[in-house]
Amino acid sequence: MRLLPMKRIATVFPLLIFALVNLPIPSVAGQFTVTTVYDGDTIKAQGHDIIIYVLLAGIDAPEIAFQEQQGQPYAQEAKRYLEKLILNKRVDIKGYGLGPYPYNHLIGEVRLKGTIINIAMIKNGLAEACHEMPPDGLNIAPYREAEREAMEAKRG
C-alpha cells in the first residue's frame, strides 16, 4: 500500500474539511423527545444519542425576560402552551438549516401526531408568522393563513 505524500495530504485535507463543514443539514432530522421548552419558539430535544436546540421555523413568539432585557406580553403564556403541547413528548423534527450566530439552533418544523406545532402556536394566537424570508424549503403559506385566521378570530 502506497502512502500519499505529505504535500498532497496538506492540500486535500483542508478541502475535505471545507466540504464537510458546508454540507447542507439533512432535510429530516427525525424523532426526538422534547426535554426543555425555553420560550414559545425555542426547544431542546434529545434523540439518536444527541441533543439539539431547535428554533421553530416560520414563527415568532413573544420573548421572555432575559437578564436586563424586558419580556414581551404573553411570553409566559406562549411558553406554557408549547410545554403543554410537546414537553416530554416524542416529536418529528424536520430541519431547514441553522439559525444565526451566536446560537446556531436548528431551524425546524415540529410535528406531533400529524399536527404542525409551529402552526398550532399561530392558530392559538401565541405566535405570529415570521415576516422575514423563510428558510429554503419551508412553505410559509399555511403559516400566513393560520395568522390571518387567528387575527379574524381575535386570538393573539
Q: What does each model-found stretch correspond to?
A:
Residues R2-P14, A19-G156:
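Small beta-barrel nucleic-acid-binding modules, primarily SNase/OB-fold domains
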